[in-house]
A protein has these predicted regions:
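A conserved pocket-lining segment of Rossmann-fold NAD(P)-dependent short-chain dehydrogenase/reductase
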Residues: 1-15
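Residue-level detector of short coil/turn "hinge" positions at structural boundaries
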Residues: 65, 100-101
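Residues in well-ordered alpha-helical elements
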Residues: 18-21, 51, 91, 101, ...
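Residues at alpha-helix termini
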Residues: 59, 95-97
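Mid/C-terminal beta-alpha module of Rossmann-like enzyme folds, strongest
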Residues: 15, 19-81, 118-120
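Amphipathic terminal alpha-helices
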Residues: 71-73, 83-95, 102-122
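Short, flexible active-site loop motifs that bind/organize anionic cofactors or intermediates
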Residues: 10, 43, 83, 97
């Protein structure tokens, strides 16, 4: 079972562990002269609400998986999450060759293929 402590309207910026590793590898091989004085980049990702994520879960794993979500609001967690950025425009990173998933469905596909316990042989 999984506890959902926030409303389904909460939006996050997401990328897979696969993309995070690709970001590091690409950054390590990047010609840094192209960065100029601004050395920070916002990495690509997917802006998605919790509702978007639940809908993608339903498409990938069915209603049975969604039924395992226990909605229990937690005001402390809601307060923390409320201060997080909701979306980014990672144009600079994209122009430099960084890339990530483009949908929540793709994020779930990557998880099932690489990170789910069944993918690990557990």
């Amino acid at each position: 079972r999984a506890v959902l402590p926030v409303e389904e309207t909460v939006k996050h910026w997401l990328a897979s562990p696969r993309s995070a590793v690709k970001f590091l590898i690409h950054a390590a091989t990047l010609d840094t002269s192209s960065l100029g004085a601004r050395r920070t980049l916002t990495m690509p990702g997917v802006a998605a609400t919790v509702a978007d994520q639940i809908a993608a879960l339903r498409r990938a794993a069915g209603a049975e998986a969604v039924d395992l979500i226990d909605r229990r609001r937690d005001e402390v967690i809601e307060g923390i999450v409320a201060g997080w950025p909701k979306s980014f425009t990672p144009d600079r990173a994209t122009q430099l060759g960084f890339s990530a998933e483009t949908s929540v469905d793709e994020l779930i596909e990557v998880y099932l293929a690489e990170d789910a316990p069944a993918a690990q042989g557990d």
